[in-house]
């Protein structure tokens, strides 16, 4: 069957309309770029509570760090200049600088505390990103689109918690066993904790909470019946 120029343009326009409609459905909902599959875990406002009383040894914290990083193909780079991290530990004075004082118990001073992205209500990282590579979903999760990231690092400068990492080198050789359910990144891209939005869409629990033996709890901040 032959197709003249006018017929081709009509067909192309129809295909574009169908594709545009499909994309619009996929992106439907304020602040959402993810489809909601059957069985997905949902919340009005996702939140996390970390009970540090449950983390009594270095192994307790390392377990959740390893589980998170393995699930999301976070590279393990020994050079601290190129380190990439989604969840990590630091001392009390670095985690809670406003609550540090001269009479703080020594045990508290020396104890490691877990850190990760705070999923801010009004995230400065999303406001300074020129390509909309980082954005806030309607449920409060601050997500990241690696393909849109141009590596300007404005989001890193805007984040007051140091929760973002930049891939100074190709991260793929530093990923041990690749998880095929989550994309690997490339050099020149920023990344951070995404509150396991990919797992929630599959109906799976946030990975760090899953392996924390009750030390990390996630739930809906707007639901009075939620664990948080």
Label the model's feature ranges.
Residues 28-37, 72-108, 135-148, 163-189, ...:
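Non-heme iron-sulfur electron-transfer modules
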Residues 49-72, 111-132, 143-162, 185-211, ...:
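Cysteine-centered iron-sulfur cluster-binding motifs in ferredoxin-type domains/subunits
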Residues 44, 111, 138:
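Exposed loop/turn and edge beta-strand positions of beta-sandwich/beta-sheet ligand-binding modules
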Residues 1-16:
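N-terminal secretory signal peptides and thylakoid transit peptides that target proteins
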Residues 16-17, 22:
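Residue-level detector of secondary-structure transition/capping positions
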Residues 7, 22-62:
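C-terminal segment of N-terminal export signals and the immediately downstream linker at the start
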Residues 3-4, 206-209, 222-228:
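Composition- and surface-driven signal marking solvent-exposed, interaction-prone regions
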């Amino acid at each position: 069957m032959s197709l003249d120029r006018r017929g081709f343009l009509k067909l192309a326009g129809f295909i574009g309309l169908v594709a545009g409609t499909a994309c619009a459905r996929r992106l439907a909902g304020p602040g959402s770029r993810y489809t909601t599959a059957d069985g997905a875990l949902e919340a009005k406002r996702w939140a996390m509570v970390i009970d540090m009383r449950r983390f009594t040894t270095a192994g307790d914290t390392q377990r959740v760090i390893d589980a998170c990083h393995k699930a999301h193909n976070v590279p393990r780079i020994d050079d601290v200049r190129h380190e990439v991290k989604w969840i990590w530990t630091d001392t009390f004075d670095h985690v809670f600088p406003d609550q540090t004082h001269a009479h703080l118990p020594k045990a508290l001073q020396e104890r490691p505390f877990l850190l990760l992205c705070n999923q801010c209500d009004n995230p400065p990282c999303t406001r300074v990103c020129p390509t909309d590579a980082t954005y806030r979903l309607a449920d409060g999760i601050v997500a990241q689109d690696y393909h849109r990231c141009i590596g300007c690092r404005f989001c890193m400068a805007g984040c007051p918690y140091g929760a973002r990492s930049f891939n100074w080198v190709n991260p793929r050789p530093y990923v041990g066993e690749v998880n095929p359910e989550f994309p690997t990144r490339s050099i020149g891209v920023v990344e951070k904790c995404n509150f396991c939005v990919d797992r929630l869409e599959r109906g799976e629990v946030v990975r760090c909470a899953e392996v924390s033996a009750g030390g990390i709890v996630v739930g809906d901040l707007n639901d009075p019946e939620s664990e948080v």
